[in-house]
């Protein structure tokens, strides 16, 4: 069976937009290649050959003052009427228990 025929659930991916909120790790040494906008359209383009039917977004280390914003933003992405798969289908947000 070809991988393209398989239904895939991506259980760990990230989206971010450093133009709207701050992600400190994007500017730290060694992460320069990631310091760009990476939205759902980019995710879909990167994996267009795969049959991703659902996905789980894991928090992308947005600054602590923006953790709720990140989950709200991702929910809006999922709810967008142009997003026919409603990705991400699950969101794992950040919670500081310390």
Predicted features along the sequence, with ranges:
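Helix-coil boundary/capping segments in enzymes
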Residues: 1-98
């Amino acid at each position: 069976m070809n991988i393209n025929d398989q239904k895939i659930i991506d259980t760990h991916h990230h989206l971010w937009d450093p133009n709207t909120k701050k992600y400190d790790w994007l500017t730290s040494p060694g992460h320069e290649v990631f310091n760009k906008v990476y939205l759902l359209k980019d995710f879909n383009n990167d994996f267009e050959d795969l049959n991703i039917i659902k996905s789980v977004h894991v928090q992308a280390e947005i600054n602590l003052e923006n953790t709720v914003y990140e989950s709200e933003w991702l929910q809006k992405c999922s709810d967008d009427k142009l997003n026919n798969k409603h990705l991400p289908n699950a969101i794992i947000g950040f919670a500081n228990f310390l």
